[in-house]
């Protein structure tokens, strides 16, 4: 035991009437919703990087947090892991996520970094034996170190490609050893700053081959989890190749990987791409590639990707409605890719941020489930497209332009516009949130 969270009680569900800030008001893990426990619907995960590795810096200032585990030794990395599992237990968090650089110190060589990762993974595995918390997904940090400034899989230097591939192999091994449900790839540096020095074709082909290697290795080692790509349009690159759901799907189709890889979709990244979160989720579900989500929010005034904890449950309810429509999570879940503000220095702030985020998502899920169970929205949606269920409409889809023209002329088809009833449906939605 450490003393970092000393005095903070285990968070329990007390209901909406509770005034205890260290209690859940909406998140009741055992509450059954649509035939499934709330915990199994939401599958919450704590992000190792924002919660335990981020020093509190921003583009205009450095570290504000003073954590006892900050440093570059394995002993401090193990202390960080011990503190992390204490918070997981306080929250009752079912999952966590990590990058390799979050959990192990950087070595002077690749071999040393590999040994460090293996040792800390053994330590984390020991901690997991005494905890209910499991690994939702692991990933490799291929963007922070200066070697990745021009990308990893898309780097013009073959040696960086090699280093990156070897790093991913080690992280996949670590993820499998810890029983991870997924493995994530995020291409923060897989993009460009200027076309003046960029070969788009080569970079795309190298990225495609890299991903094929990842999929091949997954099957070789017998990893039963899902490979996930996380889209983002920019930050840190000016233009990233995994821009949004549609772009990534085109990339997967190009390299024959659309049946092998799904997506980890982040709320903040969807906003950066000019979409709503629910749009990206609905499109991914339509394409059969919805895997998992990162839950956070941006600053809507500045437009920055601020990775704040969610607190707007009506907005989140739209997202969870699309997840319910898609059948819910299988291997995926709700990872809080969110960080407390750099002025929030106290251990209590870190715990309460997760309490608020978990309650917000639980409240959103309950609202989405009520509407989904009611069925009114789906009835209205089906009625709008009912004409396509007729034999004539189905036959038209199997015919030709010439045949359709002949039918329009013969039957004097002259369609009249029909209301989309948007305001009615918005009012319906508001009744449930």
UniProtKB/Swiss-Prot annotation:
What GO cellular-component annotations does this UniProt entry give? Answer: cytoplasm
Q: Which reaction does this enzyme catalyse, per its entry? A: alpha-D-xylose = alpha-D-xylulofuranose
Does ATP-binding show up as a keyword for this record? no
Q: Does the keyword Oxidoreductase apply?
A: no
Q: What is written in the cofactor note of this entry?
A: Binds 2 magnesium ions per subunit.
Q: What class of enzyme is it?
A: isomerase
Alphabetized InterPro entries for the sequence: Xyl_isomerase-like_sf, Xylose_isom_bac, Xylose_isomerase
Keywords tagged on the record: Carbohydrate metabolism, Cytoplasm, Isomerase, Magnesium, Metal-binding, Xylose metabolism
EC code: 5.3.1.5
* Annotated compartments: Cytoplasm
Could you say which cofactors this protein requires?
Answer: Mg(2+)
Residues the entry annotates as binding Mg(2+): 305, 307
One of the GO BP terms on file: D-xylose metabolic process
Q: Name one GO molecular function term.
A: magnesium ion binding
Major localization class: cytoplasm
User: Which family is this sequence assigned to?
Assistant: Belongs to the xylose isomerase family.
Its assembly, as annotated, is: Homotetramer.
The protein depicted here goes by the name: Xylose isomerase
